[in-house]
């Protein structure tokens, strides 16, 4: 199992909100305000990147999309409880 981890810095408020809504629609769970995670691989990573790229201003915004192994996620430490997307626990 692999995961897709996304972090972004989009300066425009309405575009940032659209980015959040799009990632949630795609099955991502919110980790922090602009950090999301989902079970998936390269195809999900590419799809999410393309969606965010359409919203971003290439001159000032930043997007980072990473495909990471499941054991890295299971071995991660966090504060604030489990990450839930409403249907399933993604990371505990």
UniProtKB/Swiss-Prot annotation:
Enzyme category, top tier: hydrolase
Keyword Hydrolase: yes
SUPFAM superfamilies hit by this protein: TTP0101/SSO1404-like
Coiled coil: none
Organism superkingdom: Archaea
UniProt cross-references to Pfam families, sorted A to Z: CRISPR_Cas2 (PF09827)
Cofactor(s) required for function per UniProt: Mg(2+)
Subunit annotation: Homodimer, forms a heterotetramer with a Cas1 homodimer.
Protein name per the record: CRISPR-associated endoribonuclease Cas2
Record organism: Aeropyrum pernix (strain ATCC 700893 / DSM 11879 / JCM 9820 / NBRC 100138 / K1)
Lineage, uppermost ranks: Archaea, Thermoproteota, Thermoprotei, Desulfurococcales, Desulfurococcaceae
Gene: cas2
């Amino acid at each position: 199992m692999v995961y897709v981890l996304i972090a972004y810095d989009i300066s425009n408020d309405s575009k940032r909100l659209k980015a959040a809504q799009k990632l949630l629609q795609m099955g991502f769970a919110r980790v922090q305000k602009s950090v999301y995670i989902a079970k998936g691989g390269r195809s999900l990573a590419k799809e999410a990147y393309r969606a965010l790229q359409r919203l971003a201003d290439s001159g000032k915004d930043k997007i980072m999309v990473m495909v990471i192994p499941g054991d890295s996620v299971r071995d991660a430490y966090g504060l604030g409880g489990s990450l839930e997307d409403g249907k399933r626990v993604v990371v505990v």
